[in-house]
From Swiss-Prot:
The organism's place on the tree of life at top rank: Eukaryota
InterPro entries attached to this UniProt entry: F-box-assoc_dom_typ3 (IPR013187), F-box-assoc_interact_dom (IPR017451), F-box-like_dom_sf (IPR036047), F-box_dom (IPR001810)
UniProt keyword list: Leucine-rich repeat, Repeat
Pfam families attached to this UniProt entry: F-box, FBA_3
Domain named F-box: residues: 48-98
Placement of LRR repeats on the sequence: 276-301, 393-416
Organism: Arabidopsis thaliana (Mouse-ear cress)
Protein name, per record: F-box/LRR-repeat protein At2g40920
Keyword field contains Repressor: no
Signal peptide extent: none
Family annotation (PANTHER family): (RAPE) HYPOTHETICAL PROTEIN (PTHR31111:SF15), BNAA05G37150D PROTEIN-RELATED (PTHR31111)
Amino acid sequence: MKRRRKDLKQAAESEQEECQSIAQVVSLGDSDQIQPPPNKKEEEDICEYLLQNFDLDHVMEILMRFPLTSLTRFKCVSKQWSSLISSRYFCNLLYTTVTRQQPRLYMCLKDDGGHRVLLSISSPSRGNTSFVVVEQDLSIPGMGGFFLNVVRGLMCFSRRKKARIYNPSTKQLLTLPAIKSDIVAQQGQTKHHPRYYIGHDPVSDQYKLVCTVAISSLLPRLGNLKSEHWVFALEAGGSWKKVVPLENYRHHAPSTEGRSTSGSVVRYMAWPDNYNCVVVSFDIRSEQLTIIPVPREIHLDEVVPAVTMMADLIEYGGKIAIFYHTNLKDEGSADLWVLEDTGKSEWSKKTLVLQPCQRHLVEDIELIVKGTTQDGKVILAPVEMHSRFYILYYNLQSNDLRKVEIKGVPDSWFDKECYFDLNSMDKSESFIYLET
């Protein structure tokens, strides 16, 4: 009898501690995060207790305070929990209301042998802004590794002409079927690598992938150009659908760099020929293409602009802009062309001249743009890296250039030919699960 009373007392104390723990969780501030349960049994107990004692909205509020690693394990407790945590409603709620970490960089490296890695890089700390540190190697087999762009925590890669979508938070990797293009390269022509861009329509909460396929005369000429576009809705039963262009459409080849994704609109720079540049916009919701001419004055000094011009598409003050930096390494100057009126194709120009004390950061160094940060800084990186990896942050508002070293890159990547891509993700955690 005494033993039975003792067991009942221990059970009551255990339940009381659990109630106190949950009550403490509920009283936490919005920014507080719950520590993950130490074992599977406690995870199951917490899940059962939540469903029995709280309504669904309250359960979701509590779940949002757990780290993503705990949510991933909670999905294994039961089908009910898996359905709840994987629901689009909860994933969007988690993404839009919870800020777990500082914006960060993702670095994709690829060597001539086909070896690829994806590295997560911390943001510069307030105490020391001269370097950032590689935190995680997020590589998984078959991930792919070039032409990386991101939207809402999802990454888009291309490998062997197929698109892959990767969520670094959940490790989900989605491979899309190859496109059966209607255009075929004839003798004397070359088929450019397909370019993939991911976007999101917030109205219908739908993710879509856009692909541009182009053929032309053998490079460096861009004669006999022909291009087509395909769109893939990332949903159950999704498939590639050809986009019907508008009347003012111009066949073009996408620029190697110069892509810009603003959620519901995907934009990239392209060349209809060797001497004319355009900005191509694709509306994710309407699936319509728009061609915006770029002023010829941007590249008047270029002999063959499509081959020699160093310019990239960025966002500046909420507007689309072209950062022309061909003269940066020799003259320390760059031009910023801002699209003021899309309908009239009106552009304004602003010339930036580096401070003399910062000229050494760019002298005789060929740089490429790797995107912009949330506060408008342009991310520049050397085309070739040897003894160390670093990037430059260019504040266009204050005309200030800052060098930031990337520490922790594996030694095997030094002093060898490699290709790399960088992308800044302001909210880099997403729990969304995609189906096709």
